[in-house]
């Protein structure tokens, strides 16, 4: 089984698309335990989601992700890169663009009551957080449209 956590409108074929709002395959609040047995999931995909959780909520979610992921299971995460946002904010000469980017990166799109950032990550912070949950083999992914974002691919220890 493959999970797309916090899918929003970005549904992935071959994945169970989970979100707090419909349309999705499974409506579920990720602030609560995942409705799957231990070590039952082959892959977890999460794009633009983890920064929407408070520090306390993130600690619970990362624990749940590790709990349901099979040993050797893949995890792929995209999130805002706070370090990149700060550097760009300080170096950008276009005041409008500077604030538009900063507000979106730090506070998210604010399209609905769930679309607000409550957390921030750097690559090293995200890796450290996931190591606490028995995750290893970290690799940086790359997608051109996500320059300045963290794209992390890793797996749960076997």
PLM segments and residue spans:
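Conserved SAM-binding loop
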Residues: 2-85, 152-156
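S-adenosyl-L-methionine-dependent methyltransferase catalytic module, highlighting the catalytic core
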Residues: 57-60, 64, 70, 74-157
